[in-house]
Amino acid sequence: MSTGPFPSSRREESSVSAPSFRFSQRKMLNLLLERNTSFTQDFPRSPGDKLLDSTNLSILSGGTPKRCLDLSNLSNGEMSASPLITSADFDDTGSLDSSGPQDVQLTEKNHHQDPMKGIPVQLLCSTPNALDHSHRKKDAVRGLSANKENINTNLKTLQWESPRIPRFQNTPGDPLASPLPLLGNGVSMDTEVRSLGSPITAVPKLSKNLNLEDQEEISEEPMEFSLEDHDTKECVLPTVSGKHQDLKYITPDTVAALLSGKFQGLIEKFYIIDCRYPYEYLGGHILGAINLCSQKELHEFFLKKPIVPLDIQKRVIIVFLCEFSSERGPRMCRSLRRKDRALNQYPALYYPELYILKGGYRDFFPEYTELCEPQGYCPMHHQDHQAELLMWRNQSKAQEGERQLSEQIALLMKKGVSLP
């Protein structure tokens, strides 16, 4: 049955328009594919990245065979599905094909790559694209964990992050270089830290448990060495070591030789100063000794009118003693030296040679009783002189307080501080 010219023309138009429709559909599909594979500012991607990309998750999910839809027959209203060819290996372009339950292995040009060798030595900065890329990886990993029942367990090796090449390479001597250990050389952070010597750990710790004797020595050293005089002139009398390192000690034998005139060719005059209290001095003292128990009397005796030797080749020496030559004798000796130093310009002194009788009168009396007058020995704590002992001690403390106050006032005046 003839339908006229119009039906035939319609068939011709449909036959002509069908290829053009398929061509337009393919063109749109190619545009979509080109859009997905267009160049971006992201870092170069590795096969591991493409495996973790969200666009490939559909291939990894489930065990159902995948079909490829043919869109060429859309004009006829038919769609054909063809099975997708799967493979467990990567092709040359780095794309991944699914092979169902087969094991997935990462290979690159037929050789294994050390994951630590590909990590950059130092990364100076990060870009927003790298951060976005890392976020996409995190989403992909969460998607894999959510669908872990349908994924092969051998895919756990894909959690390793592929090496990246930083956009900015560090230069030698760059101040912004990271101090992290060189992972590319296989050096661990612990080894790097241990190789750096710390000055804090190298310092030995001080002992907290000091003996009482050591503490006393430490507290006394500044006072002793501050009063020490480094005289280049040799001493006339032979000296020995004593309790105070800054003072010069002589033995009772030397004092006895001095009294016998053994050193007349070197010494013009000598003075033996007995620093004990008057009741001790009256109980027995060395022949020719002068009793001076206060610093004021000592200064007036020797410094009010200094004793100068007539022969410049000879010297004037002073020997101090008390009962044990432990406290009072050394204190008086230091007082005279301090005052003498203040009245002269260093290193000049009126009395450069001051000595201490080691052991005091207690050691001298038993050995040289004939050189004592009277020939007796009255100790400081004698039962018959307790009241006198208390009186002289109070007087000595008062004089010491006045001396310290006068020294502080003189020091303030020297610094220019006005007193009220």
Curated annotation (Swiss-Prot):
One of its GO terms (cellular component) is nucleus. Functions as a dosage-dependent inducer in mitotic control. Tyrosine protein phosphatase required for progression of the cell cycle. When phosphorylated, highly effective in activating G2 cells into prophase. Directly dephosphorylates CDK1 and activates its kinase activity. The modification Phosphothreonine is found at residues 64, 127. It is an enzyme of class 3 (hydrolase). The gene is CDC25C. This is M-phase inducer phosphatase 3. The modification N-acetylserine is found at residue 2. The lineage of its organism: Eukaryota, Metazoa, Chordata, Craniata, Vertebrata. The modification Phosphoserine is found at residues 20, 38, 54, 58, 61, 126, 198, 219, 226, 418.
